């Protein structure tokens, strides 16, 4: 997988509000569907050198793509299985909703991507929520989601 192809999809998404290109770029970057995914080394090239990632729930910030690369290297294996549910947004800001499965420990995830005009990721803000059982009192008011 070539990072330049993913960057071109991101650049197209930014230039023309193209959600299909953004989704395809994310699928290729993450290795979803029939795509092989990018290694952390190639993914590195999709982020600006001054990239920032915020994780507000744990009050953590990673500054620089080099720091993110070190975090990726230290991540316990295996990486989670990802199901990309929805990609929405426009121009420089895109939101991805996904389900991440860490070996049976499932989390709902929202990632806000901020991209520059060249299709590079400048900033990510990541939110994680653990799944939980819905309360019985509202069962008649809602429908179950898959």
Summary of predicted features, one role per range:
Residues 95-103:
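Short beta-strand segments that buttress and anchor functional surface loops
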Residues 79-82, 105-112:
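Short, surface-exposed coil-to-beta transition loops
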